[in-house]
């Protein structure tokens, strides 16, 4: 079973706490700070599934055959007591040695294969995680989402959202769905991290959309999709829980389709603003870090060679930059070439960074 903490058990609609969460819409994760949608004291204790403590949950129970294909499912209210908590690294160790984790991993791989057959665009882009402590010390770590444990959790969360959307569609439960238009057939993404391929293909990407009508999600390769797996940090997930519980308990729905459309209009604007702020803050702190490296040389990968400039990405920082081209560069460098650049100027508050190309990397 996939068990999601049931925040709606603790918070009634239109209470002061609910109104504040609705206004915030989402938790915000910045390098220097985290702004919770709910108070930290509640989000990390009463609302969370904690070890050895009984907590209400909304559970998606999946029944599979001996080949790990899903036969049927059930969505129900439960009370869960977590027996053990595992880090991603620990789960990576257990996969291949522990029969229960092997079964879970095999189920998740079968789900991944099914999505791929449904047209899912699976691609890998590592993420640079930037954290800033109280002394403004900047730490950077490359976050690998393609480990077996990360793929396992990701597939199970996608499955829970997919199944929930199908359940709501079949029972005409008014909820917020997410969909994504079909990508151009000429879009061919690499299964492994390839910055040149990603740069060339991203023009075909289309933004996911929220609505009250269940439509195909081409990016994930599923017939319909919603989000209900993070009610602590996404208000719209909390809405889905309330609607499903109303159906299960044969009670009137808390939200009409018209109210859901109003919530979508507001929340999409907030989420766009939050995403922009998050990107800008990450870039600011990355430039602040690189400012200490003025005069240093770093490796970069050429993405495109144009008549007036060369576009490249700093290899260890995933920062896309460009510099003025010259006759020598125009003939010399091709997409995928590894080059060395020198950091010349960095002004974080003005979002300025200037580099110069030294030559081909010796790596």
Which residue ranges define each predicted feature?
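Electropositive polyanion-binding surfaces
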Residues: 1-363
